[in-house]
């Protein structure tokens, strides 16, 4: 199967065909589920697979997917601090974070599919994972400070 990678002369059918082919190859390129968290096994990986296949068809690298993942997740984190907590802001934040974590799974799947995994890519992935973990707590603290009437001692 020829790699289409969403060139301007590719038809929608060509791109869809490339995505389907990548989905089939991704099923064989999955890492073991042994020891994986349930959320990763049943949410991140299944959502990440079509995202990885689409990124493959578009010609993206795993590191590019990592950056898009970080942008989605960190935008969600920033919105926690910036928006008043409402049902709609919560839905938006949740959607961005789920998309970000699905893309975080997709970058590794894309690397396995293309055989382009690298130490630099792994470092980039771990860097953004650490940044996401650290900033979520800060965002919640800022949200509580801005939107809730709490004694300052509770915020320490």
Place the predicted regions along the sequence by residue.
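Generic preference for hydrophobic/aromatic residues in regular secondary structure cores
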Residues: 23-27, 103, 145
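Sequence-level detector for tyrosine residue identity
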Residues: 39-42, 101, 147-148
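Short helix-loop-helix connector
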Residues: 55, 115, 144-145
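Residue-level signal for alpha-helical context at structural boundaries
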Residues: 69, 128-129, 145, 149
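Helix-coil boundary and interhelical linker segments in multi-pass alpha-helical membrane proteins
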Residues: 77-92, 138-156
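Acidic (Asp/Glu-rich) catalytic motifs at the cytosolic membrane interface
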Residues: 88-141
């Amino acid at each position: 199967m020829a790699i289409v990678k969403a060139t301007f002369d590719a038809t929608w059918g060509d791109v869809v065909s490339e995505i389907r082919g990548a989905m089939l190859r991704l099923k064989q390129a999955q890492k073991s589920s042994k020891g994986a968290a349930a959320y990763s096994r049943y949410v991140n990986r299944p959502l990440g697979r079509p995202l990885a296949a689409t990124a493959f068809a578009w010609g993206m690298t795993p590191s590019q997917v990592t950056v898009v993942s970080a942008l989605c997740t960190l935008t969600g984190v920033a919105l926690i601090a910036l928006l008043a907590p409402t049902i709609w802001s919560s839905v938006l934040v949740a959607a961005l974070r789920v998309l970000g974590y699905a893309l975080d799974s997709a970058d590794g799947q894309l690397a396995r599919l293309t055989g382009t995994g690298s130490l630099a890519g792994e470092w980039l992935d771990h860097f953004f994972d650490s940044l996401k973990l650290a900033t979520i707590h800060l965002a919640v603290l800022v949200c509580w400070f801005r939107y809730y009437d709490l004694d300052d001692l509770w915020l320490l």
